[in-house]
Amino acid sequence: MPVDRANSVALNRSAVGPASRAGLVDPAQFELPVPLGSRHPLDRRTCLRLGLSVLAGGRMVDMFGLAAQAAGSQPALARRPTSCIFVWLDGGPSHFETFDPKPDAPREIRGEFDSIATRIAGVRFSEHLGRLAAMNDRFTLVRSIRHTDSNHGAGIHYMLTGAPTRMPVGCNSYVSDHPSLGAVTARERPGPSGMPGYFALPEMPRSGGPNFLGARYAPFIVPDDPNRSDFRMHDVAPPQAVGLSRVERRRQLRSQLDRLPRVRDAAAADPARASDAFYEQSYQLMSSPAAQQAFDLEREPDSVRDAYGRTPLGQRALLARRLVEAGVPFITLFDGGWDSHVDIFPTLRDKLPPLDQALATLIDDLDTRGLLETTLVVALGEFGRAPKITQLPTGKFPGREHWPGAMSVLFAGCGTPRGLVLGATDRLGS
């Protein structure tokens, strides 16, 4: 829906910094409406820092300075962020059934779920997000992010790279016109010794790759399910029948062969030579004590693992926290299945509780350990869902269509203000 510019603050190109001008972000397409008279006005530079500086690994300032303003003091600089955990809800989660319910709207808009009160007066969440509702005084929620493309391919590309696609693309397209935020972060802020700067658990989203930055900035993908009792990251530990010393001898032999002129010349002409980077990356992980420790979830007490939830998403969130502790700059937590054209209510009854538990525990755990000051947690998808519920002719299997005109995005940590809800949709959620 168009935003009333007399009653909002819009981001425009005059605020774009060097990273944006390089094609990483086009903030002119985002608008964050703020009611006139708000105690917390937004300026363009402030909004850009929320969406750009942190995700690109740059310096993060106490952007809004809100706590300092309330206390009558000067805004303080937050410490340089060390990590970002990017919770990607693939398919486009419904804002109605998550962070922006409309309890007073007609039933065909509000849906089946009830809404519940949160820690902030007048702000309500879905009934299935009870843990996050009880702690929303510890994160910022933006309810008015939007763009203009309702196809998955273009929407994902835009949200993961900050740039529109060069031409219209369909829902099933895999587009990579620009490097992703994770790849840019890995290039600007390399990972700790022996570890990549960019991990994806359990898979890389479409448009989540490095594009022209090169394969060395692609995410290291961890497909294994850490919720399984036999979880073992196969690329981090050598095969059980092969010791690390034998792996090292193989590596030396491979290096000697690569130095042969004909092998070297053939490799130089072969685009597949990027596999060398992955081979070396795997070896570095095998020989890194920090990596071995980060992936050893058995070091965690059962109480901590239970708190995150004994689900694939919950245990991956715990693994993400351990990677943050190891110094990894960017971790994507991929959770699919949010494209709810049909069966939206039974689907989300199953999906929301694990998300609620994992995300709330992750934020709380990082905060308790003093890591939230230097870790940005972001939760989002490629778009929201349409206001009006659609049904098959039989009246069964209701769902919601794609809606790029409004979505909710959660930000926690790295100096982002606590307890703020920015922007708004109208009474119908459009």
Which residue stretches match the model-derived regions?
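Ligand-binding pockets and gating/stacking loops
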Residues: 2-430
